[in-house]
């Protein structure tokens, strides 16, 4: 690897060239000053970063010892006293309210879906950014949200019966979201603007209006025959597209060709769990796509059938407001960026001692440099109109680590000439020590926090690893019914509201991991806004459009106001450890648990290691496609490691299961010409060996994280490929 030495840093030449020739021009940043400040950041804060990781290990060792002596806690008072004694559970200070300023309404006041996408993949990133608006007709027609039964099957051509059910569903949605003062939307025959109001003519010839006229936001085209009508509910917009020249519009009595919903209000462009970025080559790709998003010039050639086209960021949507003025609605999702956490280092840059630098420090400096194209002195203000950069920080353990992230942001702001607190922080509440100290974590970032989120997947992985020595854990599928998890979900909302996040920040809920099961999502995920969350994660733009309907039905602000008087969830419930009271499962139940975990691990790891794909839809043992990333991998690997440690299964049984399920995964990937089977070459397959490492060496992984094994094995494969 060629390196450029500058200010005590040894920087990969490709990364250095990217920074100087691509990222810096147009920002007003002087390269000499940038690298000097970057070096100071690395050498001043690197030792602090490493010390925080040592503290994690020290606390884990004390927990391991306690559990070996006592097992799962029964006397919760004694257990809490121990956690306080070792500095795991910290004193809670006085009440306060966050004071985060200059927050865009998409985060502060608008409730709606949130996408998380690997920024390493330009097509996914563009699709997500453009998912601010989505066709309700397409989302319903193309998914199981509309049943295939009784002649309404999806096929290659248009099925009018299915289309009729889509239209009926959408009209029912309009009746609920923007009811008419009389009549129903299904009976509309024409729409027009008269004065500053929307007039709807019904099939019986009667004219009606909106029951709440203020819901009419604007239109495009001619007032007497508009091409679009824009309505508003709970801060979200709906565009009714009128076009009788299209097949759908021609068959519709009112000429309605589609209903477009404001969908993914925010999107996290992810540099972390959904990407596989292990070296400078990978990091440059991550940063280059983020640069394209911030400059607005990211594009990707997309092939559909025999045609190709260029996908770019969508422009804003321009309308005439109800009062006659110009109405501009954002055409793109507000973008946050998720940096990596405090754990990993990256060989892209070495410090003056030759050590790999903490990747979180590198991400902070470089992603903020790139964000200057949007929020700097010469910035476009096309993403954040409020001049803020939104950084999600994952996998932090407690307030000391949050404070360290804040210190990092302060240093980066000074280096880049940004105003104080321009870098906002999203706190992933996905580690147990952060959960139990959440109020103090928020206090540490009270001038920056714009987001807290329950990442129940990683949080479950940490739950298992933290209490690894306490006993055999309950089955993975039973975790969602465990006492700790419901208390954790409620605690996050309770503490967030106590700290004044409402109106300043998002209180988020986790991912719907089954992208093909949209009917189930429509039925179940409404629970998230009902629980007081003003955002929740969805796996696709289509899912965002369907989930957006929930925020029309539920006024989250009203829900949050009602929850303020609720007693906070019980700490004792959160601290309860999900060990099996009587681990008396049958051999068949144990083997099925192993098979399911092994298949998920192998299906994800083989794509991560062999192809550098960090987020995959992996079929489970029942052939249901599940979105897998490092968080789901962490659960499965830690669960198998726990059962191995406590003698529920043997190492030989795990190896046999892995080998057998490798053949299943191979068969599921048989249609991929680039896929390398594992089953015929267990010893040679680096991916298979990585999967074994994650389980057989699961107890020794720091906090149960999968990154060290994945990075090492991916680098091993890349080195092997270069040598071939």
Swiss-Prot record:
It is an enzyme of class 2 (transferase). It holds the Pfam family MSG_insertion. Mg(2+) binds at residues 430, 458. One of its GO terms (biological process) is glyoxylate cycle. Its EC number is 2.3.3.9. Keywords: Cytoplasm, Glyoxylate bypass, Magnesium, Metal-binding, Oxidation, Transferase, Tricarboxylic acid cycle. Pathway: Carbohydrate metabolism; glyoxylate cycle; (S)-malate from isocitrate: step 2/2. InterPro entries: Malate_synth_C_sf, Malate_synth_sf, Malate_synthase_TIM, Malate_synthG, MS_C, MS_N, MS_N_TIM-barrel_dom, MSG_insertion. The active site is at residues 338, 629. It catalyses: glyoxylate + acetyl-CoA + H2O = (S)-malate + CoA + H(+). GO terms for molecular function: magnesium ion binding; malate synthase activity. GO terms for cellular component: cytosol. The modification Cysteine sulfenic acid (-SOH) is found at residue 615. Involved in the glycolate utilization. Catalyzes the condensation and subsequent hydrolysis of acetyl-coenzyme A (acetyl-CoA) and glyoxylate to form malate and CoA. Glyoxylate binds at residues 338, 430, 455-458. This is Malate synthase G. Acetyl-CoA binds at residues 116, 123-124, 274, 311, 539. HAMAP family: Malate_synth_G. It is found in: Cytoplasm. Monomer. Belongs to the malate synthase family. GlcB subfamily. Coiled coil: none annotated. It comes from the Bacteria.
């Amino acid at each position: 690897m060629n390196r450029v030495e500058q200010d005590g840093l040894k920087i990969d030449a490709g990364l250095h060239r990217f920074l100087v020739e691509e990222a810096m021009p147009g920002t007003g940043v002087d390269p000499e000053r940038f690298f000097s400040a970057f070096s100071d950041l690395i050498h001043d804060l690197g030792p602090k970063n490493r010390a925080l990781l040592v503290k994690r290990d020290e606390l884990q060792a004390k927990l391991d010892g306690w559990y070996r002596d006592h097992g799962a806690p029964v006397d919760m008072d004694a257990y809490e006293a121990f956690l306080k004694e070792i500095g795991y559970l910290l004193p809670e200070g006085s009440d306060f309210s966050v004071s985060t300023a200059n927050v865009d309404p998409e985060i502060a006041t608008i409730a709606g879906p949130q996408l998380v996408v690997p920024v390493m993949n330009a097509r996914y990133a563009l699709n997500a950014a453009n998912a601010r608006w989505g066709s309700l007709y397409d989302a319903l027609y193309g998914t199981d949200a509309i049943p295939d039964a009784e002649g309404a099957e999806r096929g290659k051509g248009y099925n009018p019966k299915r289309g009729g059910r889509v239209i009926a569903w959408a009209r029912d949605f309009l009746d609920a979201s923007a009811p008419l003062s009389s009549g129903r939307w299904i009976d509309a025959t024409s729409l027009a603007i008269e004065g500053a109001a929307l007039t709807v003519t019904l099939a019986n010839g009667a004219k009606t209006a909106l029951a709440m006229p203020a819901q009419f936001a604007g239109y495009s085209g001619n007032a007497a025959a508009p091409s679009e009508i824009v309505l508003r509910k709970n801060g979200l917009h709906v565009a009714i597209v009128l076009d009788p020249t299209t097949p759908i519009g021609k068959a519709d009595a009112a000429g309605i060709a589609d209903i477009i919903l404001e969908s993914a209000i925010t999107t996290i462009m992810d540099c972390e769990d959904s990407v596989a970025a292990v070296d400078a080559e990978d990091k440059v790709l991550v940063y280059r796509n983020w640069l394209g998003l911030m400059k607005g010039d990211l594009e990707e050639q997309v092939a559909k059938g025999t045609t190709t086209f260029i996908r770019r960021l969508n422009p804003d949507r321009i309308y005439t407001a109800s009062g006659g003025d110009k109405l501009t609605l954002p055409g793109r999702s507000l973008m946050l960026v998720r940096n990596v956490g405090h754990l990993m280092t990256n060989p892209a840059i070495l410090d003056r001692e030759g050590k790999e630098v903490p990747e979180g420090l590198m991400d902070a400096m470089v992603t903020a440099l790139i964000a200057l194209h949007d929020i700097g002195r010469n910035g476009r203000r096309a993403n954040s109109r409020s001049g803020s950069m939104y950084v999600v920080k994952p996998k932090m353990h407690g307030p000391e680590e949050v404070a360290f992230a804040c210190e990092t942001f302060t240093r980066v702001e000074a280096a880049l000439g940004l105003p104080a607190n321009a870098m906002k922080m999203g706190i992933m509440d996905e580690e147990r020590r952060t959960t139990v100290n959440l109020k103090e974590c928020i206090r540490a970032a009270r001038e920056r926090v714009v987001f807290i989120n329950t990442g129940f997947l990683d949080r479950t992985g940490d739950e298992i690893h933290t209490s690894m020595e306490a006993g055999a854990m309950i089955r993975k599928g039973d975790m969602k019914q465990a006492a700790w998890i419901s208390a954790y979900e409620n605690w996050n909302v309770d503490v967030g509201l106590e700290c004044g996040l409402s109106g300043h920040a998002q209180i988020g809920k986790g991912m719907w991991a089954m992208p093909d099961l949209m009917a189930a999502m429509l039925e179940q995920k409404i629970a998230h806004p009902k629980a007081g969350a003003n955002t929740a994660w969805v796996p696709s733009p289509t899912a965002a459009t369907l989930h957006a309907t929930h925020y029309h039905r539920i006024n989250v602000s009203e829900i949050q106001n009602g929850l303020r008087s609720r007693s906070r969830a019980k700490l004792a419930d959160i601290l309860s450890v999900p060990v099996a009271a009587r681990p008396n499962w049958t051999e068949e139940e144990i083997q099925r648990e192993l098979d399911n975990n092994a298949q998920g691990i192998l299906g994800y790891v083989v794509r991560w290691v062999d192809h550098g794909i960090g987020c995959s839809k992996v079929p489970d043992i029942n052939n249901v496609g599940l979105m897998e990333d490092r968080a789901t991998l962490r659960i499965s690997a830690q669960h198998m490691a726990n059962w191995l440690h406590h003698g529920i299964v043997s190492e030989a049984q795990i190896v046999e299961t892995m080998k057998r399920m490798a053949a299943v995964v191979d068969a599921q990937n048989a249609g991929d010409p680039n896929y390398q089977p594992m089953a015929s070459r267990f010893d040679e397959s680096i991916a298979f060996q990585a999967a074994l490492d994650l389980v057989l060496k699961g107890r020794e992984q720091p906090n149960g994280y999968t990154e060290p094994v994945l990075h090492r094995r991916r680098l091993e494969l890349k080195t092997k490929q270069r040598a071939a």
